[in-house]
């Protein structure tokens, strides 16, 4: 049975690169895919082009779900009989030269492309973050709070360029929960929730030693350390010397300008804080880390869907998250922070570490179960198929 990548490679009929000075290939890459049989029309996808240029047997990158998403979105339209053109969301040179029935695009570059499409094209904005105004306000607020609390000023990596994708879209897709949805409700556009397709899954934590790991916690996230609350978590654990924090994320690469310098002592010279750096979620090392921890702590200030939290839940970790982390959590398997303060984080950490082994086991198993039931590639594909059916019905009405 062919993989998605192999299937798409079989049906690629034309691939060309446009080279421009100081422009990476994926900013101008173009892929044209044809279905088996007669085409029902054209679809334009503006998202991650890199996925379509993988070498034979090269795995889909697991550092973000968007690499698989791009392939699957194209594949769904192909299976339904459409011709699909794929460009990178950073492609600033592409001009639509044909009629498209449907346009799926991420927030970047959406407005420019939407203005160039035929009027009857149905335009879908794939929003993988909260609204940029909310996001940027939250990012600045966290940096301001850090300045007031510790006299440290850092630039946020998470500031997003303004965009008007929602204003030019007919439909909106999101990967998060009600929080993310609320930031777009002002538009009065139809909003469709897609479950995050976790990059990897893990076996049920049946052999986990909960007595041994009850005081070990994990912060796991991508760039934007202050935005995602790592500074708060670090300060909480400085006051909990008998509890341990493991940090997995691109600390040295982070562009929160000098986070690793400003927090060097805390990161690398504190007995109960263990900084790993970026971790491959498919590696035995990461599995060992999750097996040795009881919970993930993720007090993010704004997300489009907390993919790192979902990965941790798949590994059987109990989620301790902010509402803005945009992951549905209830008290049967996790805790939603109400204040995102150091004192609250300390209180919750002590509460979790003090629970009975059977309580911890039940919560961890439930987190794993919810992740397996909701956040899978199969469920993402099903939800996107349902969306396409709705768009097709809308297209028929518009004709």
PLM-predicted stretches and their roles:
Residues 147-172:
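Membrane-proximal helix-turn-helix segments that form the acceptor-binding/catalytic region
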Residues 249, 258-281:
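Nucleotide-activated donor-binding/catalytic signature segment of Leloir-type glycosyltransferases, i.e.
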Residues 184-216:
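Acidic anion/phosphate-binding donor-loop and adjacent secondary structure
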């Amino acid at each position: 049975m062919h993989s998605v990548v192999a299937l798409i490679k079989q049906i690629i009929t034309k691939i060309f690169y446009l080279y421009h000075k100081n422009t990476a290939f994926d900013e101008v890459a173009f892929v044209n895919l044809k279905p088996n049989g007669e085409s029902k029309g054209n679809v334009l996808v503006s998202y991650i082009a890199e996925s379509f240029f993988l070498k034979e047997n090269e795995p889909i990158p697991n550092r973000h779900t968007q690499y698989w998403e791009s392939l699957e979105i194209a594949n769904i339209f192909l299976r339904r009989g459409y011709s699909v053109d794929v460009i990178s969301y950073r492609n600033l040179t592409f001009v639509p030269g044909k009629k498209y029935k449907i346009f799926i695009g991420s927030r970047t570059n959406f407005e420019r492309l939407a203005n160039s499409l035929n009027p009857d094209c149905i335009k879908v904005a794939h929003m993988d973050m909260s609204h940029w105004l909310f996001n940027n306000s939250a990012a600045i607020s966290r940096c301001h709070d850090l300045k007031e609390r510790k006299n440290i000023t850092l630039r946020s990596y998470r500031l997003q360029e303004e965009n008007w994708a929602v204003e030019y879209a007919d439909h909106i897709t999101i990967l998060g929960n009600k929080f993310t949805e609320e930031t777009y409700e002002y538009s009065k556009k139809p909003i469709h929730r897609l479950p995050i397709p976790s990059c990897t899954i893990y076996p049920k934590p049946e052999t986990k030693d909960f007595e041994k790991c009850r005081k070990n916690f994990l912060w796991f996230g991508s760039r934007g350390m202050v935005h995602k609350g790592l500074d708060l978590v670090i300060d909480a654990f400085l006051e909990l010397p008998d509890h341990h924090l493991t940090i997995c994320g691109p600390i040295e690469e982070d562009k929160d300008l000098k986070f690793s310098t400003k927090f060097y002592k805390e990161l690398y010279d504190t007995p109960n804080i263990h900084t790993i750096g970026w971790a491959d979620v498919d590696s035995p090392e990461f599995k060992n880390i999750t097996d040795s921890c009881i919970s993930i702590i993720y007090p993010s200030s704004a997300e489009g869907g907390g993919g790192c939290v979902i990965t941790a839940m798949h590994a059987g970790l109990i989620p301790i998250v902010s509402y803005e982390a945009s992951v549905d959590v209830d008290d049967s398997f996790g805790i939603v922070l109400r204040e995102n303060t150091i004192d609250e984080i300390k209180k919750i950490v002590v509460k979790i570490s003090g629970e009975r082994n059977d309580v911890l086991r039940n919560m961890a198993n439930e987190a794993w179960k919810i992740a397996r039931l909701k956040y899978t590639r199969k469920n993402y594909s099903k939800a996107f198929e349902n969306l396409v059916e709705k768009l097709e019905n809308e297209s028929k009405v518009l004709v």
